[in-house]
């Protein structure tokens, strides 16, 4: 048990660090070099240096971010300092003596402390050992007693010239309430004047603890103490303390055999350690003050300390881990303006990040050095080489596991890309992975190597060429011009990408998919996508040198989940903006999770986040996305959660996903609101009791408690009331616990506890994964916004975690856990109920004969626990409800939403048909007007035909003539006939084109309508089906409750009847036990049967629901088929319809010709003789032609 045996021990400070070493501290700004003695205090809390004037400067170990030596340390720039250190002499050994300590409150605001030792290689030893203290898990996650001890150590180190502790230092250390500090000093019989001083010998640790108890009394702990100590005695025995530890400080879910409860002899060691009175300790007694320090000790850490260490299996494929990832790593401020810095790569990697981004752009002449910057913005540039050197220096200081360099490559120069590749090879050396591992070839179906396989390696993520043909850009200076496209490989000379055959075909498929997808987007959507993606969509082609460095992380454009599953290439990765990823997650969450089981995805902020703000990473962790990249320079809530979560597992930057999110045979829906298979949900209860030293001012404060997890988790945020007074030293909140009833997947959830000042000013917070929390009373030491531990502020809380149990099963669980206690309580309730109701109605006890035989000493078993009784309970439970039914297809089609949509669609189609008919009529009218202008054969000028009276006729007559429409004066009948035929042909062609366009438009609109209607029906069907499943479960729960009530009534009746049969108390107790045991068996059987019934009904209902959904899909196919058949039929009859319309038009325009010249010799074939003579003649001429 960790309470008795802490997993982690405090860091040990090497003797030479505490003894000190002589250095020269220099500063480039002041050009001052001063001799100092550099030391670390024996407990490893502070790095400090003393000047010759005895002046002392402190650096909290928790504020140190890095230590550097040799060529990576800072170098003096001023000539004055360079002369002091003889740096310009050829045999100078300056690099062997350098030491730089980097500190700061966050990754951007940094201070560099520069030292030079008198001896060689001293700086290296100091850099390594000080950094080891900084990276120790307990440095940032120490117990409350450790942080309080830090205050004492600092007070005793900050002495005046007389070697005493100035009282003013107490006022500076505890500034919230000066009067309370003075009163606490007086209570310890110490001077309290501002100009007074205290002898360090008069202020040992016991006096310091008494001072703290006076300054910050703990009445809330006294209340806990009085509830467990011996009555009327001011101490707690070791037996009482053992009971307290086992009941309150121990996780009730632990197995008693694997994790045995504490014993009194083990607890004695805790009393010896924390009880201030030696006499009490010898007697095995703990005082209230000892209880306070016990609850502040490392044994009561709120964290499960083993979770801080590397405890995950690191031999799984790379895509089975969440990977700490950064976006636009080089930026120190916003995305549009601000400084870029290579130092950010160091700081991000030191924080445990394992994926950094490099936006590479072409360098300018004459040097043509590639640069890193945010393209098309006002951010500054840094050299690519400088960034690579920073990465090489800090790559594996925090974690030995692989680093991924995510290149956004805009360098369109083969020469500069070759230079980039050369820098990577020479600076990274053996750290760079240039070839795939033998066990993990780049083939479909082969998983990625594990973090352990890639330990100490750097992987490149950059576009990879489809073919790697021979290039000479890096060798031939007179070769290819910059900005030109890469040379295409001659047929038969190129090598297929990643050793796969048919890749060219696959790439063509991808391109076709992309073209098809982009073809469906309008201009505004394309612009929006480009603004969301930023410059990521403008990457250039990779040339051979850079392409050859890419292996296991090959980026490609995402097509679809089905396409990725078909290709099954684990080494292919796709990047998504947060908006695109959210869209995919909301539409196909299960497929997204399955995709991440097979290969990797990277999510990055949308391009419109110009202030470098972040999105919440939790939603994408829920989908199993590995690289959820954030802006590390912005310490907002998403970044705070990211830093807190990746602090665990040895700060390795890799967190193994839950088994359910890795197994291909399991499906996981992150939006599930029900139980997740093989995962036990957790109920978390947190009581915020009090706070200590929350602010440097006297203010009112409140606490927020928030849960990050799956969308289906319970209420996410609670808040206490404001503290009753402006007391920030020890406020107490007397409120009910905050309960998160059903945390579906505890491994994915985190708890945030934040303290805010009145006016919503942030004071401190802590974010801890649910599975890293310990149950019991704990002091929660707060952290800053940048996740740095705060020395003073803390909260005292009570945490209780247990397995989630549905309300319907709560009584049964209690009964099974402790049946005697449960039924005793029920008997007490029954007696009280009987007294209140005036006694239960008397009923004959049905089992009198067996009971009598038992009283007389017979051994025949009673029927209470007989199989017959249990069978009766089963039969009662077997009374199945009516066959579960689901909404039919007809009912779904009659739903209001579907009917309303159908009416809208019908209206749209009617309007479309009207527009088509109007266009058709306009064409006929225009054709008729042109024909009318020709007039009868042999007559020129205006025609004799009127198509309609009034405005319509005027409008038609005012239509513009075509040059060929009118007959020339004196033109003969043959000329007019030729022009009639020409106009007729043109009109037919226009009508055919109009008809085809109209029918195609109608078809597309019908297909769209079908898709919308089916989508609506599917949506409503799923809503209905979810409601049906919920109703089925509720009905089952109600039936179970009713059955339990009936069985409870039967149990009470049996007990009542038994008391009338016998007065022998021993026999009554025995029979009562048997009745209770029988009752428990019956309840178990009933619940088991009811559960089976529910599962059976649920299975039947789901089958029916699935069949209904399949009917909807079939209906979609049928509708599409009908629409297509109608389209084909109308297209088939279009030509005849056009000819008929044109003939009707000709008849209308030349009625006189049809009447006056029927006797004229017909030149047409016999089959056309019955037609209008003029039309027949025109048709005949057309057929001859």
Curated annotation (Swiss-Prot):
One of its GO terms (molecular function) is phospholipase C activity. SUPFAM superfamilies: C-terminal domain of PLC-beta, C2 domain (Calcium/lipid-binding domain, CaLB), EF-hand, PH domain-like, PLC-like phosphodiesterases. It comes from Homo sapiens. Residues 546-662 form the PI-PLC Y-box domain. Ca(2+) binds at residues 328, 357, 359, 408. CDD domains: C2_PLC_like (cd00275), EFh_PI-PLCbeta2 (cd16209), PH_PLC_beta (cd13361), PI-PLCc_beta2 (cd08624). This is 1-phosphatidylinositol 4,5-bisphosphate phosphodiesterase beta-2. The lineage of its organism: Eukaryota, Metazoa, Chordata, Craniata, Vertebrata. The production of the second messenger molecules diacylglycerol (DAG) and inositol 1,4,5-trisphosphate (IP3) is mediated by activated phosphatidylinositol-specific phospholipase C enzymes. In neutrophils, participates in a phospholipase C-activating N-formyl peptide-activated GPCR (G protein-coupled receptor) signaling pathway by promoting RASGRP4 activation by DAG, to promote neutrophil functional responses. InterPro entries: C2_dom, C2_domain_sf, EF-hand-dom_pair, PI-PLC_fam, PLC-beta, PLC-beta2_cat, PLC-beta_C, PLC-beta_C_sf. Pfam families: C2, PH_14, PI-PLC-X, PI-PLC-Y, PLC-beta_C, PLCB1-4-like_EFh.
